Amino acid sequence: MEKKTYSYDEAYNASLEYFKGDELAARVWVNKYAVKDSFGNIYEKSPEDMHWRIANEVARIEAKYPNALSSQELFDLLDHFKYIIPQGSPMTGIGNNYQIASLSNCFVIGLDGNADSYGAIIRIDEEQVQLMKRRGGVGHDLSHIRPKGSPVKNSALTSTGLVPFMERYSNSTREVAQDGRRGALMLTVSIKHPDSEAFIDAKMTEGKVTGANVSVKLDDAFMQAAIEGKPYTQQYPIDSANPMVAKDIDASALWKKIVHNAWKSAEPGVLFWDTIIRESVPDCYADLGFRTVSTNPCGEIPLCPYDSCRLLAINLYSYVVNPFTPEAYFDFELFKKHVALAQRIMDDIIDLELEKIERIFEKIDSDPESMEVKGTERHLWEKIYRKSGLGRRTGVGITAEGDMLAAMGLRYGTEEATEFSEKVHKTIALEAYRSSVNMAKERGAFEIYDAEREKNNPFINRLKEADPELYEEMKKYGRRNIACLTIAPTGTTSLMTQTTSGIEPVFMPVYKRRRKVNPNDTNVHVDFVDETGDAFEEYVVFHHKFLTWMKVNGYDPDKRYTQEEIDELVAKSPYYKATSNDVDWLMKVKMQGRIQKWVDHSISVTINLPNNVSEDLVNQLYVEAWRSGCKGCTVYRDGSRAGVLLSTKKKDKKEEEECRCKPPQVVEVRPKVLEADVVRFQNNKEKWVAFVGLLDGRPYEIFTGLQDDEEGIVLPKSVTSGRIIKSYDEDGTKYYDFQFENKRGYKMTIEGLSEKFNKEYWNYAKLISGVLRWRMPIEQVIKLVSSLQLDSESINTWKNGVERALKKYVQDGTEAKGVKCPNCGHETLVYQEGCLICKTCGSSRCG
């Protein structure tokens, strides 16, 4: 039977009704989570369809085991994102037969044993790409690569060090599209590695390592030496008793560099590695393949090579009864029941993931390539399949911590609020582990469970002290899952739960947005006119749960409030002095450390700081994070991303301002030869290529065409730049050739670019080239291209490819005027490294 499909408008309008008029939540759901095929057909009308899809699939797995949950019971937990929310890949992929992809949100890879050869480095590169094409975020560690200058037995004679390979892995990430996005990558290195300083500095140079997050693994000895001003020994190999390279460094100086770079550019993040390993339950089985080596891209799941994790969030706000009233209380009994069910659902999702990997095997085996070509991907998924089934790792987390505290009448960041949060997370830990023990009775423990191995683990002993009976049950029956808990970022999840994100406080309870209006329309109130003459009306937006507080306390949400009245409202609410800008940052770090004691994996938190904070504050926050028992920490200083060095040449302020304000010169007569970049993109299922002609480093013209077809452009994949040459026939007809150097240094020419292109696309490309030639600002060209109303689906996807090709030329820090952040709704998007990054909430959108 043919499945019913829906138009975008049908799905959007149904979702808008589902989310009670929340446009942002509706668009996020339709764009990211509704089931679609590769032709863009939409098979789900609203999140209700999605929740039945997930409930039916999980119920199918439940039926294999005793005491099975029904589809209806599961649906009731998922409906309206009220209690339990599978995050990201599980939400998209469970029951979705239109894509062959993993359900895992994150992976870590890395070869066993001596893996510093060129072959090993390239193998990791290939594995990284294979995972990213199946929707996975990937992390891996570089501590195994020899430091720069080390002797090697090849024609180079000495090692290049790890920085060139950072760039390689970063570039691979940028190549891979996951549903229109770049891949996500975390690169880590031990501070003990002699090249760690170069690693820490790698992203401070313009355009370098733009496709990866970087974090440095800090041990306790380094932290102690940095604080006390003592020397610290770096060596390679980092764990060797007889290192081939060793040197003493000034720990304080390197620590200051870490702090400075984090203050300047928000990276590197820091991972307190001794804390991670000491607290890690899976590392009790390190000799059996569960030695933690790196983390996923957001840092909340430290993992061993070829292990993976799936994420789920419990909506804490939904357990507050009578929210925002003096009678408010937290329903711990219902909460305990649901935590147990969340752990159970996550175990079911592991079975669903193993089925998905079996489909990946079938796809690889049916591909026409030889096993020599596809063997790496097959072997990679075999290792992941084995490790996933062996440990059965889960990632049960939370969202809406900030709203939960406000609904209870507690102010985020106070001692009273932190104590309550600690109680909630202790409850999660005990009930998730109790559920895992009960599943061990019904379904069997994870294969290598051994109570003797875990007896000295601090996390396990915390559980033992809190609930001795649970510990004895675990010793007797084992546990279903090697590790259970995390706290991950919940960006789009919290948009759909309509709550605060993760364990974060509310960003702002009330803020203003602008919408464009026609000043000639009746009943229009014009509050603002921009420099182009466009008129805007300002309107107040209330955070969803602040709106609930208003209604509970008798304030009319439909009234038009003055700013003074809004300030008075906020001051009366539990959100007062509890926003991300108001919260005491040191107290927030201490809160993270206290909650971390009840989370067996890690917590992903970014401390958002105003632009004017000092480096000393960043130093204090990082040191406090280490002392408080946090496993990692990241800071983001407002505006710091745009503040990364744009070039290695220094300019004084006056020169910088002149450069920024001076418009590029219009050159009406095109030079005979222009330098050019090559940008590849997908147009539906076809591979296309764009040639972007550059004048003074700015796009001057663009040619696009089908790549590798019989009449199209045959161009080696290694070619990323060249020259576009304008010439004339004897009759005066002009034509354009593309010239590049091949790997052997010979000039190769592709003749007649304009003759190789479909005339329909050619005309649009001429239009775009025309506005580029007259030096319209690139961000405005992108806006123009985006606004083209085109009927053909192919033309529209081509248009999107052209937008992506041009975005890389927008100067970092340029505002995307009139464009709202899909995450927080603010018009605070700036271009950074070809991506749009929100200065308000830090979310990014690439491609």
Predicted features and spans:
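Short Cys/His-rich micro-motifs in 6-15 aa windows
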Residues: 842-847
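Short, Gly/Pro- and small/polar-rich lid/capping loops
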Residues: 471-473, 647-694
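Catalytic alpha/beta core of large soluble enzyme barrels
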Residues: 23, 299-301, 350-354, 460, ...
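Conserved, charged catalytic cores of large soluble enzymes
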Residues: 2-71, 154-168, 178-290, 321-326, ...
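Internal maturation/activation junctions in enzymes
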Residues: 74-75, 235-237, 338-385, 389, ...
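Short, cysteine/histidine-rich loop/knuckle motifs that typically chelate Zn2+
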Residues: 822-826, 840
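Terminal amphipathic helices with adjacent charged low-complexity linkers/tails
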Residues: 218, 279, 284-286, 296, ...
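Function-dense linear segments that define catalytic or interfacial modules
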Residues: 57-64, 77-154, 162-165, 176-179, ...
